[in-house]
């Protein structure tokens, strides 16, 4: 008889350790323990130039949003440091000068150290109460019995309503986008809409990255179940130095906190020059649960205030342990804050997960992260025996692994979360008039090995103000931006400079440079040459009025009528010089004022030409 025992292995694999079961609704994953998870990508403001008061206000607003959560709720916040997109591909620069400028910048960018940027994600998990507790609550509270959804449907609807409330509360602090699914088509050559349709899931893609360190699209099955096997299909080697697939894992734990917190206290981690995932987990507790835990600590410290003799005989002659007295007061103060509803307490766990194919490089990077944490005043250690459990606890939706028991309140949590970020700019130019997915205007650099993708546009508006001291390089910067603008197809630049600051670039790039009113310039204008339409005629009337005002004349309704009549007559003439226009004016005072701009005056060589000198 054939023995099949060796083929029926009961050993635990990676999918068995994951808590992901199915997707009951759009953007929601249900865990094996019955929990529900929803995730967002978010980004805080770049507060590099903000004051301490502004940062404190930001933390307070986030705390106000978090105190709405209680027992059964858990939040995972991940700050993912990853390599930035490389320099844009070759663009159709129309001349050698601007092409060489961009080529030199490309070489410089590629020769610099690694360029990284941060992506921020948040997962909100809710574990419903046990069925027995729900049934008891149904006995206590009476009301209309109209349960057509069942317990699972009620829990799901309540969770979705809670998500909307949470999004509304946190929208004033963080700009977020829910992780959802998108529909795609395989497509055929020449027929992109033909072929089989499939669904890509952003949330599962994010979960897969947290597990394997690989950022790849994840297709959602037609029956969205057994998600643990879908995204946990890599071999896991446990031990002191765990490994998932080809990537070795190092977990750096924050196991000691400073005496006080301040907003953005871990912001320096956002500038490290290595890839990592900084995970913060917070398991919320209701007020009565937190007070029960605190009361145990209060009793312990009360017993330490006086010696055994004083406690037995109930005397107060012995020395008082001032440290125990202070600790008791701290606990009682925390209990009063819980009672007031200003803060919520919970279990906080923070880890930085580093993955790399080379274990030697991984150890160097882990030591670099540990050193950065120690310099911030925190305690840090590289996990060994506890590495696998710490890594599992950092995965979104996992609540049972690596729970740190000391309580922390939500205001401390707000100070330690990555709610501020270094702004790296839009990945593509946001102007709708450029081709789709056009690169940013230029690549520059900001703090912490982070590139800055500079685009002057916000939507279709590109208004920009540049301030700086005299000789600080403003004109050079403007000329550089003009040169970079030629990366877009059919680009044109019209520039007004001062002191010939744009002369070199204009001539080197094959442009036309006009020295208006210069000593050797022959450029002259014919401002009234295009007054064939009503819009141009209206503009001409306003422009002539401006010339009169500059000469100190007062514009009356009669003057305005005379100007309009003259413009009308000039529009039927083949000669549209200012001299011809002045001859159409019937008012002597107006003719005298306008002669200043004709060949009879000092500006006639500039404004009284028969045709525009611009090419």
Model-derived segments and spans:
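Short coil/loop residues immediately preceding or within conserved phosphate-binding loops
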Residues: 461
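Extended, folded cores of ATP/NTP-driven motor/assembly subunits in large transport
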Residues: 1-421
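The conserved Walker
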Residues: 458, 470
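P-loop NTPase motor domains
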Residues: 52-68, 292-296, 390-452, 503-510, ...
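Hydrophobic anchor at the beta1->P-loop junction of P-loop NTPases
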Residues: 466
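Conserved hydrophobic/aromatic pocket- or pore-lining residues that grip, position, or stack substrates
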Residues: 352, 449, 497
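Walker A/P-loop NTP-binding active-site region of P-loop NTPases
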Residues: 472-526
